[in-house]
């Protein structure tokens, strides 16, 4: 049984404990509190944060890749790399592709989930495409966008061994809407995204069971005061959790502030939507035959269209705190607690009884140490 005592500025849902400790035993948090008030096991290994922040591990519900590693080609490599960016859990995410390629990718990710590679935990799979609107494909290949097929999805879920946890759909494209209750009954979290839905269409989808929104504001019919669209429904309905990309370019910090004011921190989930170029130096790259430009924050085509983010969740956390102006408590709720709640997992907060997924973070938002279920999976040199 491994035991650890982590000392530092401990960030709990109730606030910051300036001289706090987290006791970890057998993969779970055994105790959290002021150092003077917590009984420390004498045989525990001490990990001193040297006054730096001890935060819950971040959870990314939407990531395609980083460091030239993609969810399609090497999801185990993705899991290994993410703890360097304060991420302890994630949903590898697939966009639109041919039925054969989608099936193969799903099968390979499911096999990796089963083997449980070292690093950040794969918490399931996010199928962002192909069941989206041809009017709002974003950076997806429009050729592969197609209407929802119950038969195809069941084959994909079987190949995934039941690991498809999150499914993005455009509910206004028939026949997607009619299958929402059945998907929810199977335990799938249904999200609206890449959608041209009107306000009424979006609200009807929410009534049927949609409870999540994929990268709100992006690749979705924009808000208009005479036709609020899906964005209006997402902002208004308390039962919908909204993903937001935190690179400061996909969504202006002021828009993120408005989103949090409308829904509260408990209604927002930070995501990266990071692409395989994330983590690489700014510059010009060629990926799958396309020229792409990265400024280190976001990735664009030469003509300026956004195709994905180059910012991981630790960078998104910086955006929430330094540009949006949120408190650390609010920012960590959005980056850790809400994603954990969406997935129904006992993590995302530094509380006794929860999984010991935590990070020692320096003032530059870089992890000094990342722990997943009580195992140190990354430690800075």
Tell where the protein language model's regions lie, with residue ranges:
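Metal-associated gating/positioning segment near the N- to mid-region
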Residues: 49-105
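N-terminal metal-binding scaffold of metallo-dependent hydrolase/deaminase domains
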Residues: 1-40, 371, 376
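Active-site gating loops and adjacent loop-to-helix segments of metal-dependent hydrolytic enzymes
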Residues: 57, 80-91, 133-161, 203-216, ...
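Active-site core of metal-dependent hydrolases
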Residues: 154-280
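Active-site mouth loops of central-metabolism enzymes
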Residues: 61-73, 139-146, 189-193
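Active-site metal-binding motif and surrounding structural segment of the metallo-beta-lactamase
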Residues: 37-54, 158
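Conserved, mostly hydrophobic/aromatic
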Residues: 51, 62, 127, 183, ...
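His/Asp/Glu-enriched, well-ordered alpha-helical/loop segment
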Residues: 232-243, 248, 260-272, 277-361
């Amino acid at each position: 049984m491994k035991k650890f005592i982590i000392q530092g500025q401990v960030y709990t849902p109730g606030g910051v404990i300036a001289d706090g400790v987290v006791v970890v035993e057998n993969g779970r948090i055994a105790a959290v509190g002021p150092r003077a008030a917590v009984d420390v096991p004498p045989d525990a290994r001490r990990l001193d944060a040297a006054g730096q922040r001890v935060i819950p591990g971040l959870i990314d519900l939407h990531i395609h890749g980083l460091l030239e590693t993609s969810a399609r080609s090497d999801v185990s490599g993705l899991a290994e790399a993410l703890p360097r960016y304060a991420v302890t859990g994630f949903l590898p995410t697939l966009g639109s592709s041919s039925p054969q390629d989608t099936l193969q990718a799903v099968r390979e990710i499911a096999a990796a989930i089963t083997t449980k590679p070292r690093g950040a935990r794969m918490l399931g799979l996010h199928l962002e495409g192909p069941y989206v609107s041809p009017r709002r494909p974003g950076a997806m290949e429009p050729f592969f966008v197609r209407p929802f097929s119950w038969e195809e999805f069941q084959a994909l879920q079987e190949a995934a061994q039941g690991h498809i946890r999150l499914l993005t759909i455009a509910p206004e494209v028939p026949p997607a809407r009619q299958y929402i209750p059945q998907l929810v009954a199977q335990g799938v979290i249904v999200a609206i995204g890449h959608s041209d839905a009107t306000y009424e269409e979006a609200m009807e989808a929410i009534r049927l069971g949609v409870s999540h929104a994929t990268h709100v504001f992006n690749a979705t019919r924009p808000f208009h005061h005479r036709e609020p669209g899906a964005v209006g429904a997402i902002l208004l309905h308390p039962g919908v959790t909204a993903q937001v990309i935190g690179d400061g370019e996909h969504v202006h910090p002021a828009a993120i502030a408005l989103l949090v004011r409308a829904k509260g921190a408990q209604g927002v989930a930070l995501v990266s939507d990071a692409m395989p170029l994330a983590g690489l130096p700014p510059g010009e790259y060629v990926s799958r035959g396309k020229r792409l430009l990265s400024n280190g924050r976001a990735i664009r085509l030469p003509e300026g269209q956004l195709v994905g983010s180059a910012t991981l969740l630790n960078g998104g956390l910086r955006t929430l705190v330094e540009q949006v102006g949120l408190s650390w408590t609010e920012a960590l709720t959005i980056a850790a607690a809400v994603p954990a709640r969406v997935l129904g997992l006992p993590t995302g907060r530094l509380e006794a009884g929860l999984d010991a997924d935590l990070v020692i973070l320096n003032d530059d938002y870089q992890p000094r140490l990342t722990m997943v279920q009580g195992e140190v999976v990354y430690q800075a040199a």
